């Protein structure tokens, strides 16, 4: 809600979706994908922080207070590389920390948007979270603030031309 209230960009129509049943088939993402038919999708999610004892920090490289994570792939999703580059540039431009992660055994809602209606440009950003899927988790306020700033700046500067460019690919003969 905070993000939706702060982005004022007449060039885009912004939808905020809170989805359900990600863990059992991305069902909420399926419903919103079919109803909204978005041009570009930015999934905001959480991911395991591997900076606590007992967690494999190779498998889970994200650390609290090192910035949000950009998911490079999961078992159902592969991000649009132009969106990845645009978000990396936005982070650099705003001097914001950004980590990178992958997930071989889980999935974000991005996987559903990858395949709906011929596929949509999608990218997933995650807040590193300790004790994910427990009765309480822990995030860093600095990571939250960096994520909010990154997305706000990205959406505020988004144009129809940029949105169209995310879907344009050069055909190789």
Q: How would you name each of these model-derived features?
A:
Residues 2-8, 34-36, 114-119:
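Alpha-helix C-terminal capping segments
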Residues 4, 27-30, 111:
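A generic local structural motif
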Residues 65-148, 154-173:
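Active-site-adjacent substrate-binding region
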Residues 27-97:
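Metal-dependent peptidase/peptidase-like ectodomains
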Residues 17-24, 46-48, 129-131:
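Acidic, glycine-rich active-site loops and adjacent beta-strand->loop/helix elements
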Residues 21-28, 173:
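Short, mixed-charge aromatic SLiMs
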